[in-house]
């Protein structure tokens, strides 16, 4: 029997990959699944989904289908099944409370909610109340069962226009999250630009420790490796000791791997001991990896170092938040020269900018260059007149002041999303009249010696981009000067007493805004830190007006699943509401002396 699936770049690639190559490995169970089985599983699941929803190929086209499935083969099959139906996949985070999941289901107007066996009770809780229209509830049976006789798969073009894709929800700070609609064309373009820049290959084994309701986990670590024929090994949620054990496993004897040999047998055991060549994560994960290495056994430390050396870990990527220099430098030292590659992206556009594969193109503090097919520009806004000007290449330095010009990153190209779901006003607000997406992120462009020469590809040429922060949260206007919170954070994090840091702008009677730091002290170094000692430590590192004028020490900094800090909420929780901050500002002016001629 022949199975027919709609043609797409993803399905065409999967069909053409070596059938015996491993597509997915589930680390916990040791189960592995080959590329030859994947489309068969998708075809069977598609038949079930259409039958359970009472739809056909044409009537399901463009419908939103939510799913609550754990990381692993079943997730991959479910996502591809929805794409095969020409529908829009809406991945749900199992960690979210029921009210948040109900909001996403309501907002997306989901036709159906698919659940794995693991999350049936969670799905039933979500469906029990509070929904405008209750979606059909269904399970796709047997997605993990591999048929002994694999049927021939053929692809055909869509009978109607492609309307499928994925809907991811942005994390709202002042409003409820918005549904970002990414068409299959967007997803394909996003995956292809990464494939060209980062050179995914069938020989790659990618360790997947990320949540799958964010762009990082779905496009960078799932769809792109599938397009390339790489192997994806799921190991979520992240556990630092488990990850070090997995990385070290290929370089240890069986008896040295605590309990690992008991979980697997035969060929499957071998799959969980294939060296990891590709690991993409967020800065908090890299920080925890560095800290945990010292606590490993001597044998595990030695094997771990071999595992993450440039000879074995081909590519280590950091993103979704700024990478502190101490983490970057610490990883280079631990690995014997493996430089973390930084990149920049967001839900609406996938990845947009990236450093290159060549070490000279992995520039400290930079997110590199526009990826293949991505157009990027910087738009400068005059604070007084609100007049906007494009910062042309070669004009990065202001001719009058001699300072670097800063502007908003704006993007255009096939990777950019089609719009916010059922929200034309918000969509129109985020695009310029000439069709560029306004990211809200502020950056400078700078030519860096020995980099941007095209060694990593023709796309990685010229001046590199350096993110200064979010326009709304990370650009602090104090006494007529603009301060990048990210720049100040990098310098504070270079101090040995500091473990974590967030720099924010607070209302100030004297300066409009003042720079403030919220710090977690290092448990290794110990001791304390006062505002005066912080300012003294920074006065030789950054200009006086950038040095924090306020300081709070906290036990921890709250972060979301991707390691990001909501600075608006942080200011409220640490410093209080605006009027309280203003009173604090007045009080501090009367109590605090000016240090060494700097503003207090």
UniProtKB/Swiss-Prot annotation:
Name by which UniProt lists this protein: CoA ligase FVEG_12633
Gene3D superfamilies linked to this entry: 3.30.300.30, N-terminal domain of ligase-like
Keywords per UniProt: ATP-binding, Ligase, Nucleotide-binding
EC number per UniProt: 6.2.1.-
InterPro entries, per database record: AMP-bd_C (IPR025110), AMP-bd_C_sf (IPR045851), AMP-dep_synth/lig_dom (IPR000873), ANL_N_sf (IPR042099)
Keyword rRNA-binding on entry: no
Coiled coil: none
Entry binding sites for ATP: 170-174, 214, 321-323, 342-343, 347, 441, 471, 564
Family annotation (PANTHER family): ACYL-COA SYNTHETASE, ENZYME, PUTATIVE (AFU_ORTHOLOGUE AFUA_7G01530)-RELATED
Domain of life: Eukaryota
Species this chain originates from: Gibberella moniliformis (strain M3125 / FGSC 7600) (Maize ear and stalk rot fungus)
Residues engaged in binding oxalate: 564
Region spans: SBD1: 241-342
Residues covered by region (SBD2): 343-420
Induction per the UniProt record: Expression is induced in response to 2-benzoxasolinone (BOA) exposure.
UniProt xrefs under SUPFAM superfamilies: Acetyl-CoA synthetase-like
Pfam families: AMP-binding, AMP-binding_C
Disruption phenotype: Does not affect tolerance to 2-benzoxazolinone (BOA).
């Amino acid at each position: 029997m022949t199975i027919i699936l709609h043609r797409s770049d993803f399905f065409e690639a999967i069909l053409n990959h070596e059938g015996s190559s491993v597509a997915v490995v589930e680390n916990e169970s040791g189960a592995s699944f080959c590329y030859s089985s994947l489309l068969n599983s998708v075809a069977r699941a598609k038949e079930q989904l259409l039958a359970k929803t009472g739809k056909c190929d044409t009537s399901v086209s463009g419908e939103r289908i939510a799913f609550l499935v754990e990381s692993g083969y079943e997730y991959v099959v479910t996502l591809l099944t929805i794409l095969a139906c020409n529908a829009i996949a809406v991945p749900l985070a199992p960690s979210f409370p029921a009210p948040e999941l109900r909001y996403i289901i309501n907002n997306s107007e989901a036709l159906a909610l698919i659940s794995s066996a693991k999350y049936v009770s969670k799905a039933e809780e979500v469906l029990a109340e509070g929904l405008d229209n209750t979606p059909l509830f269904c399970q796709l049976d047997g997605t993990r069962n591999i048929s002994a006789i694999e049927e021939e798969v053929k692809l055909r073009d869509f009978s109607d226009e492609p309307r499928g894709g994925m809907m991811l929800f942005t994390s709202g700070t002042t409003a409820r999250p918005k549904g970002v609609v990414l068409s299959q064309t967007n997803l394909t373009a996003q995956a292809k630009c990464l494939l060209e820049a980062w050179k995914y290959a069938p020989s790659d084994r990618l360790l997947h420790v990320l949540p799958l309701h964010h762009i990082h986990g779905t496009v960078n670590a799932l769809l792109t490796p599938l397009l390339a024929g790489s192997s994806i090994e799921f190991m979520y949620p992240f556990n630092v000791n488990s990850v070090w054990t997995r990385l070290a496993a290929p370089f240890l004897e069986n008896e040295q791997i605590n309990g690992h040999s008991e979980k697997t047998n035969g060929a499957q055991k071998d799959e969980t001991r294939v060296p990891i060549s590709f690991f993409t994560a967020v800065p908090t994960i890299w920080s925890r990896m560095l800290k945990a290495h010292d606590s490993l056994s001597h044998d595990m430390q030695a094997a771990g170092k071999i595992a993450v050396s440039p000879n074995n870990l081909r590519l280590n990527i950091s993103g979704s938040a700024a990478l502190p220099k101490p983490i970057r430098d610490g990883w280079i030292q631990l690995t014997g020269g493996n430089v973390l590659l930084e990149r920049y992206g967001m839900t609406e556009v996938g990845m947009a900018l990236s450093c290159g594969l060549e070490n000279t193109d992995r520039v400290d503090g930079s997110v590199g260059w526009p990826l293949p097919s991505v157009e990027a520009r910087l738009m400068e806004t005059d604070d007084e007149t609100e007049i906007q000007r494009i910062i042309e290449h070669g004009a990065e330095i202001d001719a009058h002041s001699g300072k670097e010009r800063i502007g908003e990153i704006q993007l255009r190209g096939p990777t950019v999303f089609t719009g916010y779901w059922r929200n034309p006003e918000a969509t129109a607000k985020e695009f310029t009249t000439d069709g560029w997406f306004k990211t809200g992120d502020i950056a400078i462009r700078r030519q860096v010696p020995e980099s941007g020469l095209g060694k990593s590809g023709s796309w990685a040429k010229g001046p590199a981009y350096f993110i200064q922060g979010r326009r709304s949260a990370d650009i602090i206007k104090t006494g007529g000067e603009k301060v990048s919170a990210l720049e100040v954070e990098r310098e504070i994090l270079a101090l040995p007493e500091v473990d974590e840091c967030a720099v924010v702008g607070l209302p100030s009677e004297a300066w409009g805004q003042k720079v403030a730091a919220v710090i977690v002290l290092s448990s290794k170094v110990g001791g304390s830190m006062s505002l005066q000692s912080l300012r003294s430590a920074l006065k030789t590192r950054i200009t006086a007006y950038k040095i924090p004028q306020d300081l709070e020490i906290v036990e921890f900094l709250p972060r979301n699943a991707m390691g990001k800090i909501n600075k608006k909420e942080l200011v409220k929780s640490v410093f209080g509401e605006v009027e309280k901050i203003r009173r604090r500002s007045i009080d501090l002016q009367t109590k605090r002396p000016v240090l060494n001629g700097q503003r207090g």
